[in-house]
């Protein structure tokens, strides 16, 4: 399996257990993971520096993932940041809504670890650290 060594990933989720689980899965593959408990904190981090990949929950209080990705796409270089939506909603129309809002891909909760790593590799390896 390919490694995620030195890939900087921002994980955004209001559930601390989900954040910890995602961090563990990604760090186990060698990624450098930053976490944010909400979209506002994530946006603050993203305004300072863009990671190689954003993994964000969709349903969060105050600012949801759809609003977050819309604001990210307005940032300098934000239009090219790979972003994966996380949600408990598994209907096809939910997936389409995530893609229309600006996410590149979509994962349902509970997250399948192999599918998470496959998608993260797909996007991170397409944009290596020096790109």
UniProtKB/Swiss-Prot annotation:
Gene Ontology BP annotations: phosphorelay signal transduction system
Presence of keyword Hydrolase: no
Keyword NADP: no
InterPro entries from the UniProt entry: Bact_response_regulator, CheY-like_superfamily, Sig_transdc_resp-reg_receiver
Keywords recorded for this protein, A-Z: Phosphoprotein, Transcription, Transcription regulation, Two-component regulatory system
PTM-bearing positions, type 4-aspartylphosphate: 57
Positions of the Response regulatory domain: 8-124
Protein name as catalogued: Uncharacterized 14.6 kDa protein in sodA1 3'region
Organism expressing this protein natively: Leptolyngbya boryana
